[in-house]
Curated annotation (Swiss-Prot):
Alphabetical UniProt keywords: Ribonucleoprotein, Ribosomal protein
Listed GO biological process terms: translation
Family, as annotated: Belongs to the bacterial ribosomal protein bL36 family.
Any single Pfam family the record assigns to this protein: Ribosomal_L36
Name of the featured protein: Large ribosomal subunit protein bL36
Membrane-crossing segments per the record: none
Domain of life assignment: Bacteria
UniProt xrefs under NCBIfam families: PRK00831.1 (NF002021), rpmJ_bact (TIGR01022)
Lipid metabolism as UniProt keyword: no
Length: 41
């Protein structure tokens, strides 16, 4: 999982990427390609 300041570039890497909020943190997850994960902060 990458930790990034901005998730905009992480979101557009793949069309299956979704932005979700968990426990006050923002994550990018991808069910089809689980390697495409990122967290903001």
């Amino acid at each position: 999982m990458k930790i990034r300041n901005s998730l905009k570039s992480a979101k557009v890497r793949d069309k299956n990427c979704r932005v979700v909020r968990r426990h006050g943190r923002v994550y990018v997850i991808n069910k089809k390609n689980p390697r495409m994960k990122a967290r903001q902060g």
